[in-house]
């Protein structure tokens, strides 16, 4: 089991979880409307391989504080830097999933001495504004209103959405439960408020990830998920990814682009494969 502690600074508390191991350290950063528990199948594998691993709930998420401001990348990147400093992780490899990839990318460009390399898991290379204007993005990508949904219905929804893709073990179920508060009547309420979700979405829409990738000066591995046609999370984004892949490959060193088969929730679907890619990348840049 990881050790847990709460860090407080800049007006927000951050729930941090640590798995033992040695250098090179690894920082795991989750995505939008997720939590540090998305890494629950990956982090133990990294730790067992001898790598010290730290994950945390980003502001607004999980058991961290939920201020009504500070969701731009300057602030969320500073949160990541604060976790690195407080846990004495040195210059870790920073691994971000989805929005978390955009967070660590911005951190590396603004403060490259904080990290030694980046792994961007199905995020950090798309520009939302290439696909949507803001009013459309706000409408299409707004979160569903799940507040008040009975817990059993929510779990049935998860089973349906991930059918044939991820086995819903007690560990996986716990990941999804970490995203919700359950009231006395057995109904769920998302821990990330709709208002804060939209604040983050706006920051994502405004960020130019491709321009940041051109400016990054650290070894960077982009792991883009190639979803099968018809899977729920392919939803038009495969064409967007294909176009972005071409643009990213023109950047060249130190940015490397690779496809990996799976679904967007890769840390749950293929934790062993993902942990292996992270370990090999970290070992290569250490030497």
Each predicted region: which residue ranges?
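Flexible "cap/lid" loop of the alpha/beta hydrolase fold
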Residues: 109, 116-150
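Conserved alpha/beta-hydrolase catalytic His-Asp/Glu region
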Residues: 130-131, 149-203
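Conserved loop-alpha-helix segment in the C-terminal half of the alpha/beta-hydrolase fold
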Residues: 217-261
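Hydrolases whose catalytic domains are alpha/beta-hydrolase-1, hotdog thioesterase
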Residues: 103-107
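Active-site loop/oxyanion-hole signature of alpha/beta-hydrolase fold enzymes
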Residues: 7-10, 43, 48, 54, ...
